[in-house]
A protein has these predicted regions:
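Glycine-aromatic micro-motifs
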Residues: 1-115
């Protein structure tokens, strides 16, 4: 069964790593409650905190989900050393609440610019 995933940075259409989504089915623009941080050349999403972050939702298969997890550093032996974890959250996809996977930033807000 396919999974739904919300992407908000380098995986979005036209971004530097959008090629990773070539085997995914684009479902449309979406937004999630959260704050986007400038980490380096890539962003990090902290869920909640009152703002809205725009992104896109894709339908993907298990193999692509595994590849994206590797790209985002998920599944490390000690995930506390990673930057992200993958969580299920509700986004608004074309205005409708939809449960999706999201990569959330784990390292906090301090020292990072809000974008």
């Amino acid at each position: 069964m396919p999974d739904l995933i919300f992407v908000y940075g380098a995986l979005r259409k036209g971004a530097s790593n959008d090629w990773r989504m070539k085997d995914a089915r684009w479902l449309g623009p979406a937004k999630v409650e959260g704050t986007l941080l400038k980490i380096d050349w890539y962003p990090g999403l902290v869920l909640g905190l009152g703002g809205w972050v725009k992104g896109e939702v894709y339908e993907i298969g298990a193999e692509l989900l595994k590849e994206l997890d590797e790209f985002e550093g998920i599944g490390l032996e000690d995930e506390r050393n990673g930057e992200y974890h993958r969580v299920k959250r509700e986004v608004l996809l074309d205005g409708s609440p939809t449960e999706v996977w999201i990569y959330e930033w784990l390292k906090g807000l301090e020292g990072f610019e809000v974008v």
